[in-house]
Amino acid sequence: MESNLHSGSRLARLQNDLQQYQQQTFADESSVGPTDSRQMPVWHCRGKFPHREYKPLQFITYRLYDSVPKKVIEAWKEELRITEMTLPNDPKVLQLRNRIDKYEDAGYGKCFLKDERIAFMVQENLLYFSGIRYNPLSWCIMPNHVHVLIDVKEGWTLSTIMHGWRSYTAHEANKILGRTGDFWMDEYFDRYIRDEKHMNDVINYIDNNPFKAGLIDEDHVWPWSSLGLQSARSGEMSN
């Protein structure tokens, strides 16, 4: 995961501001003992991707219903089952991650999240329960998928949080578009954060996703992201 944001001083400052908060959050959560019941993983499968309800830090990707061909999803399910217990830097895991990246950034499907009305609504929904159900540490709303890194609050499960995000935004997006039917894909990916290096890698991955996908150049920030929101707020304060 390359960091392309360090070339511009303004972008570097934005990223540093975010990382100070993110690293403090990781330090606070790391103080919880390993035998604390809040740290114990709980698995959910329901015939789809296995999901780990893990507190505190989770990296989540969820997608529009038509963003990935169905046959690819079926292949991912089997590979995820096989690789779930392997080390994250295992070549098989890295190859799978590269293939997933390819489909995420290829712009398959109708890409409803390109509509600024919908991207804005999805971001507002993400921030609505900030500090209540979770703390959003980093996020990026791409044309056909969303990446989020959150610190889950005690008493809340990932499945509850995901339902809250997707049910409301699907309903509102369909109203905006004047359509009915599926909006989000049922399956989603989640990974718990193992350590500070893993967290920083994930943050760099999220921050750089619009650049990698060719949506912006390296001197700009994607508006529907944690960096974009921070940039907008910095601009408001300087005016």
Indicate residue ranges for each PLM-predicted region:
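Short catalytic/metal-binding and nucleic-acid-binding patches
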Residues: 1-239
